[in-house]
Amino acid sequence: MSPSATDTTEVMDPTILTLRKVLTSESEPLGRRFRALFSLKHLACLQPPTEKTLPAIQAIAAAFTSPSALLKHELAYCLGQTRNPASLPFLQQVAKDTEQDTMCRHEAAEALGALGYEDSLEILKALRDNQNEPEVIRETCDIAVDRILWENSEARKAEKLKTSDFTSIDPAPPLPMTASEPSIPEIEQTLLDTSLPLFLRYRAMFALRDLASPPDLPTATRAVEALAKGLKDPSALFRHEIAFVFGQLCHPASIPSLTEALSNQSEAGMVRHEAAEALGSLGDYEGVEETLRKFLNDPEQVVRDSVIVALDMAEYEKNGEVEYALVPDAGVAAA
């Protein structure tokens, strides 16, 4: 099933049609396309699903023909958050497509793990075990397989997980709660131990994230400092996920390490772009916007695009906007 094969005439809702046109138009500013995407994501993720859910999923998938790796990777992420099997064929196709950008394929594989359906195991295992695939694809599929197996296991039912402040479906759940108070040094040790499975290390990562939110939690700064050490990990995939978590947390203690990651020209593009977007979510802190503007002409396209989106997000933060999204009014939607 081709992501571009959906028929726009099937999409009757004028709001979805308008958002789809913005999202798929290469002449629209990137920030506006991202806002359209997040509006569609809201509709695609509604639980229980409504009559707008499937058209919204199809509208998101229609933009996989874009040349923008940044946009396509965000499409995949959004589809992975839908909890809807209608997203599976689009994501499976992108994950397998070796012509697609590696960052986009990685995000599609991660999204299949987030959806948690066992139908995806065959594809993910094949990619994980294919030595011709880039390391980031193999590592992503390794984590995604473990997540799906965990999602469908009896062991999961026995685990007690801390209630998270975050509604995102993550590549791994946090470590299960124990009778004793969580020890940040112990969790940090798991986070940084490269001999352990990536899935377990990701569980430590998300456990630390949850100990860092809200930012005035007594454990928050120490948890952020522990996470920051992960930005020195040998795995680019791991480093990029640390930056993503920092974007969720919006904790000022992460600004120095994010700035260092973005400024490092030898760092992987997927890490630098995630650092840029994370800084965008911290845009109301002094000096952050100035830092981002330095990279508007970066040699790497995905970094330039991320800075554009990050500055757009920072502008929304400054203006006190409730949600980073595009809401067409009735007149525009009907146009």
UniProtKB/Swiss-Prot annotation:
EC number from the UniProt entry: 1.14.99.29
Major subcellular site: cytoplasm
HAMAP family registered for this protein in UniProt: Deoxyhypusine_hydroxylase
InterPro entries membership: ARM-like, ARM-type_fold, Deoxyhypusine_hydroxylase, HEAT_type_2, PBS_lyase_HEAT
Pathway per the UniProt entry: Protein modification; eIF5A hypusination
Gene designation: lia1
Family matches, as Pfam families: HEAT_2 (PF13646)
Protein's name in the database: Deoxyhypusine hydroxylase
Keyword match Cytoplasm: yes
Gene source species: Aspergillus fumigatus (strain ATCC MYA-4609 / CBS 101355 / FGSC A1100 / Af293)
Domain of life of the native organism: Eukaryota
Localization per Swiss-Prot or TrEMBL: Cytoplasm; Nucleus
Residues annotated for Fe cation 2 binding in this entry: H240, E241, H273, E274
Cellular component aspect of the GO annotation: cytoplasm; nucleus
Annotated cofactor note: Binds 2 Fe(2+) ions per subunit.
Function text: Catalyzes the hydroxylation of the N(6)-(4-aminobutyl)-L-lysine intermediate to form hypusine, an essential post-translational modification only found in mature eIF-5A factor.
Cofactor(s) it depends on: Fe(2+)
Keyword Repeat belongs to the record: yes
Family affiliation: Belongs to the deoxyhypusine hydroxylase family.
Chain residues that bind Fe cation 1: H73, E74, H106, E107
Catalytic activity field: [eIF5A protein]-deoxyhypusine + AH2 + O2 = [eIF5A protein]-hypusine + A + H2O
HEAT-like PBS-type repeat copies, ranges: 71-97, 104-130, 200-233, 238-264, 271-298
Gene Ontology terms for molecular function: deoxyhypusine monooxygenase activity; metal ion binding
The entry's keywords: Cytoplasm, Hypusine biosynthesis, Iron, Metal-binding, Monooxygenase, Nucleus, Oxidoreductase, Repeat
